[in-house]
């Protein structure tokens, strides 16, 4: 934080540095750089953040990890997926009224969708709606 305050850095680069900081703030485990975890970061924070985090890990490590390089290359070509379930669909198909309940259901569906690497079945959607 003080570094960002002390030196004149653009807001865009400040955001990039903060994203890297928050990613590494949590304890790093073997699952931290799994594709499913990086997909979660990719969806919520964007392509640039994932690439920055992977590149920082490559620069920080003492030996070359080809898996990280391949992950980095794979994220250069990816686009952020759109969630297949929309509010209109839930309102028409399941007769859910607009409001907090609809928002909560959409949020739970989105979390499940991201957790399953951007895949969700109709059965999973129905289970979430009925709970």
Where are these regions (language model features)?
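C-terminal subdomains that position terminal phosphate/3'-OH groups for nucleotidyl transfer/ligation
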Residues: 1-131
């Amino acid at each position: 934080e003080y570094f960002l305050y002390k030196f004149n850095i653009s807001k865009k680069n400040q955001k990039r540095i903060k994203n890297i900081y928050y990613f590494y703030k949590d304890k790093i485990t073997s699952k931290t750089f799994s594709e499913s975890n990086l997909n979660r970061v990719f969806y919520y924070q964007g392509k640039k953040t994932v690439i920055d985090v992977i590149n920082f890990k490559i620069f920080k490590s003492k030996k070359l990890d080809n898996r990280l390089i391949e992950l980095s290359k794979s994220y250069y070509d990816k686009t952020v997926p759109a969630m297949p379930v929309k509010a209109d669909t839930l309102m028409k198909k399941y007769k859910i009224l607009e409001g907090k309940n609809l928002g909560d259901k959409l949020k739970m569906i989105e979390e499940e969708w991201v957790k399953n690497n951007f895949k969700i079945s109709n059965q999973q959607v129905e289970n979430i709606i009925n709970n």
